[in-house]
Every structure is written in C-alpha cells, then in structure tokens.
Swiss-Prot record:
Transmembrane segments: none annotated. It comes from the Eukaryota. Zn(2+) binds at C121, C126, C141, C144. It is found in: Cytoplasm. Its main location: cytoplasm. This is Ubiquitin-ribosomal protein eS31 fusion protein. Its cofactor is Zn(2+). In the C-terminal section; belongs to the eukaryotic ribosomal protein eS31 family. It comes from Candida albicans (strain SC5314 / ATCC MYA-2876). Ubiquitin is encoded by several different genes. UBI3 is a polyprotein with one copy of ubiquitin fused to ribosomal protein eS31. UBI4 is a polyprotein containing 3 exact head to tail repeats of ubiquitin.
Amino acid sequence: MQIFVKTLTGKTITLEVESSDTIDNVKSKIQDKEGIPPDQQRLIFAGKQLEDGRTLSDYNIQKESTLHLVLRLRGGGKKRKKKVYTTPKKIKHKHRKHKLAVLTYYKVDNEGNVERLRRECPAPTCGAGIFMANMKDRQYCGKCHLTLKAN
C-alpha cells in the first residue's frame, strides 16, 4: 500500500509499505529518500507519536494515510541549583493596629474635662485631627514634615 509522509518543509514523500511493516522500517525508508537518520525522526499520525517497535496496523494506518515527520530536538536546559543564602531573610515590619489608639491623645480628668495630650499640627495642609509626634527635643508632623523645637 502507499502512504504519504509530510516533512517540515511542506514536501510530501510517497512510500510503498505493508500494514505489517514496523515504524522502524518506515523510518529507514524515509532515511533512504531524505537522508535524515532514524534516531532524529519523529512520526506523528492522528496527533500521536508513533513508537518504533509497533506496526502500521497497530495505529490503524491504512492506504493513502498521511504521516507527519518532525525532527527530534536535542537536549534541554540544565536544572538550576536552588540558591542557599548565608544570612536569614530580614523580617518585614508588621504594622500593629491598636484598638482605641485615639485615647492616647486625650486625657479625661475626674470632673469629665477632656485635655489634649498632643499638639495638633498648625499647618493649613494638615487640618484638624493630625497630631504631632513628641520627640525629646522637638515636635514633628508626619504628614507635612513640620518640625517645632521645644524650649
């Protein structure tokens, strides 16, 4: 029977084979016509790669079927070693949320009067509710970066 082999270049080769022929036998016939060694050939039929020891009838290849010839790729990339670090990773700073943190800015005395413990930023860009941080010799606004020296 006659089968067709389509190469990568689009060229179609006709081969005269029997259904009892092995895939090895077909590859050697392709080598005779094209000069490609059998170990570099991969034959594909109906989306499946054909194994060397099997016959054409195992894959239900009939007369005038078309096989696709693909060349085998060489090797693959080396597997990289995992990097071993000498120092441990730096632990990221975790933002701790304090419940009712606003209460640290005010003090309520026995008579119910509310006293502000921290100073509000006087800059017009900050607005109400922006408090200045107390340092040992100054007060600092974290929003507008205003610094006031303490006397």
